[in-house]
């Protein structure tokens, strides 16, 4: 109530049109311009009589390679990277296919990490956090150490090996799914479905808690 617009910038997806939320004081426009500087959101408000009568909204895509870098900021970044430059640019492999991390349930970069965890830890199943950030790589592009850090630096320093029953795995999947798909937004905790390697399952987002996961 009393808020005309909320400009969001932390969703991983650019939302092309505002969500209009009706409330006791009128309506509130909620926008999201994605993350990592992908878009610049432009919101024009037509104000009449002290109230918003109309609005125009658009997302302007940012092509960073076409924009000249700010000299001072560029120098600051290069100075900070200098001690680690050789290590960050080390080439680890070349990808044969598109590596991305954009799906709500999985992505090819997720699968690469899961395969690596299972191989390194000799595990039948692997779990990985449900993130959707990180750099996408085109087929034939080198995977550098920086790309690896880009994908894993937040939580992967801690990797554990545990024995889990099928019932425990289903409980984990149901709990994460409820954080995402609970019809009450106050119980939704954001993020995405935990990534799973070595196990296939079926998820019904519209089912109730305890009944979303099947076909394991």
Which stretches of residues belong to each language-model region?
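Glycine- and other small-residue-rich loops at beta-strand/loop junctions that grip anionic moieties
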Residues: 33, 102, 106, 161
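Active-site-adjacent helix-turn-beta-strand microarchitecture at beta-sheet edges
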Residues: 1-87, 180-188, 192
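Feature captures C-terminal
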Residues: 21-22, 27-28, 39, 111-216
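A short C-terminal boundary segment appended to hydrolase-like catalytic domains
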Residues: 46-143, 152, 201-209
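A generic short-segment signal for beta-strand/edge and adjacent turn/coil regions
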Residues: 8-15, 95-97, 128-132, 168-172
């Amino acid at each position: 109530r009393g808020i005309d617009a909320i400009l969001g910038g932390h969703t991983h997806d650019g939302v092309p049109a505002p969500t209009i939320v009706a409330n006791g004081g009128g309506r509130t426009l909620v926008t999201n311009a994605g993350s990592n500087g992908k878009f610049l959101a432009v919101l024009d408000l037509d104000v009449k009589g002290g109230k918003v009568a109309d609005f125009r909204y658009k997302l302007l895509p940012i092509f960073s390679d076409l924009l000249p870098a700010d000299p001072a900021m560029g120098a600051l970044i290069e100075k900070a990277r200098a001690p680690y430059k050789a290590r960050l640019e080390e080439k680890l492999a070349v990808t044969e296919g598109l590596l991305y991390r954009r799906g709500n349930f999985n992505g090819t970069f997720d699968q690469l990490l899961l395969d690596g965890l299972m191989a390194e830890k000799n595990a039948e199943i692997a779990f990985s956090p449900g993130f959707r950030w990180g750099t996408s790589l085109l087929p034939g592009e080198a995977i550098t150490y920086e790309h690896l850090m880009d994908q894993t630096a937040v939580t992967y320093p801690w990797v554990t090996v545990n024995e889990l029953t099928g019932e425990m795995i289903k409980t984990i999947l149901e709990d994460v799914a409820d954080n995402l798909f609970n019809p009450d937004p106050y119980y939704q905790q954001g993020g995405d479905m935990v990534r799973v390697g070595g196990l296939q399952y079926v998820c019904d987002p519209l089912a109730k808690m305890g009944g979303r996961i099947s076909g394991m």
